[in-house]
Amino acid sequence: MSLFNIFNISGSALETQSKKMDVHAKNLANSDSYIYKNGTLYPYVARIPMLQFDPISENNVGGVKMHTVAGDTSSLKSIYNPNSPIADSNGYSKVSNVDIMSETINAITASKNYQTNLEILNTTKNMIMKTLTIGQ
C-alpha cells in the first residue's frame, strides 16, 4: 500500500462522516415535523446512512462511501393527544420515530470520526515532510 493511499482513504472517510453528520442533523431538526402528502399529514421518518467499503485496489484496501440513505423501518410512535388535529378517532397521533438520544450520539460519533481522520491526514503529511528532510 502506498503512503499516498492514506490521503484517498482518509479523504473518503472525511466526506462520508460529513454526510453522516448531515443526515443526523436533518433527523434531529425534523424530529417533530410532518410531511403533507395527498391531503394527509405523515410524521417524519428517521433516515439511516448506509455506508459501503470503497476499494482503492484489489488488495482489499480502501476507504468508505455513503451507499444510500434509507428510511428507518422501526414503527412510528403513537401518543395520546386527543386535541391534536391529526389524532385518530381514539385520540392517538402518530409521531416521528426519530430517537433524539441515538441521533445525538451518532452525530457526535461522526464528528469524532471526522476529527480522527483529519488528524491521520495531518500526521501523514508531517511524516512525508520529515522524510523529505532526511539527508539534508
Swiss-Prot record:
Keywords linked to the UniProt accession: Bacterial flagellum
GO biological process, any: bacterial-type flagellum-dependent swarming motility
InterPro entries named among the record's database cross-references: Flg_bb/hook_C_dom, FlgC
Q: Which compartments does it reside in?
A: Bacterial flagellum basal body
Q: Which GO terms describe its cellular component?
A: bacterial-type flagellum basal body, rod
Q: Which domain of life is it from?
A: Bacteria
Pfam families annotated for this entry?
Answer: Flg_bbr_C
The signal sequence is none
Spell out the disulfide connections.
Answer: none
Task: Show the PANTHER family listed in the entry.
Answer: FLAGELLAR BASAL-BODY ROD PROTEIN FLGC (PTHR30435:SF2), FLAGELLAR PROTEIN (PTHR30435)
* Family, per entry: Belongs to the flagella basal body rod proteins family.
Describe the subunit structure: The basal body constitutes a major portion of the flagellar organelle and consists of four rings (L,P,S, and M) mounted on a central rod. The rod consists of about 26 subunits of FlgG in the distal portion, and FlgB, FlgC and FlgF are thought to build up the proximal portion of the rod with about 6 subunits each.
Q: What is this protein called?
A: Flagellar basal-body rod protein FlgC
Question: What's the name of its gene?
Answer: flgC
